[in-house]
Curated annotation (Swiss-Prot):
One of its GO terms (biological process) is amine catabolic process. The active site is at residue 79. Its cofactor is pyridoxal 5'-phosphate. Homotrimer. PANTHER family: 1-AMINOCYCLOPROPANE-1-CARBOXYLATE DEAMINASE-RELATED. It comes from Rhizobium leguminosarum bv. viciae. InterPro entries: ACCD_DCysDesulf (IPR027278), ACP_carboxylate_deaminase (IPR005965), ACP_carboxylate_deaminase_bac (IPR020601), TrpB-like_PALP (IPR001926), TrpB-like_PALP_sf (IPR036052). Its EC number is 3.5.99.7. This is 1-aminocyclopropane-1-carboxylate deaminase. The lineage of its organism: Bacteria, Pseudomonadati, Pseudomonadota, Alphaproteobacteria, Hyphomicrobiales.
Amino acid sequence: MSLLEKFERYPLTFGPTPIEHLPRLTAALGGKVDIYAKRDDCNSGLAMGGNKLRKLEYIVPDAIASGADTLVSIGGVQSNHTRMVAATAAKIGMKCVVIQEKWVPHYDAVYDRVGNILMTKLMGADSRLVEDGFDIGIRKSWEDAIQSVEDAGGKPYAIPAGASVHKFGGLGYVGFAEEVAAQEKDLGFIFDYIIVCVVTGSTQGGMIVGFAALDRADRVIGIDASGTLQQTRDQVRKIVDATSELVNLGRSVREDEIVINPDYAYPAYGVPSEETNEAIRLAARTEAMITDPVYEGKSMQGMIDLARKGFFPEGSKVLYAHLGGAPALNGYSYYYKDG
């Protein structure tokens, strides 16, 4: 029985996302481990999709039931999350206010005019640029935005950064784990490792709960892209505990089942290293799989490096969770002007 059976879901995605073998990337990494990708970057027709839609599917019913008329959320200037909240609001007929903080020390001349923020505005969201820097916690700028909607006579529905510390924020990726388990039956094998980027925490947190039900939570390897490891780990822990209780997992998730690798977040959140850029190019040139410099490029870098170092035993089958994020590339065009 699904852990999610009792929860209402508002469909924003096409359904189960495909799992794709990546033979050319596998070969480029020496062929000792088989690399696959689960394509959550291709999960919806809503504004290029991405992982946040899995989360929002379980949040929207609560938003509608609350009688809200405005979704209010927060992210960085090139936030995938605020793009997805804007898309969701447009789809369900609500207004949208998003705070876009300057989380990233990146100064491309078009950074605040292209990619995610452009699409967010195009979908009618009230996008408010704020100078505050990076922090995955609850932000005053977001609380002020919620209050501003109330002051104008509206009824806001608050969605935190990444939809992560929302009470239903982890449910979507519990569903991801159940979906992978069903697909493994068709594939005829079980993945040895799942690689996923982690920043605000509910994507990996939900996966951990879902795979804990299968006694495989420690095979979910989070690649930190926040650069604030302890804060991220603490938030993942809270999300895991809250989500476990919500879905009646029936046991506590052990500390050793929460695996986060901090080695690839440098030099800062939202700033790619040369190794990140090399990973982005390798995925693009072997598999035409586009990753971004903020999140997926760093998790791709991590997976590539771990494979080359021999972290995965020979013969392992590794599943890369592609969470989306390609629109952000437009804000980093100078890095890739020559490919």
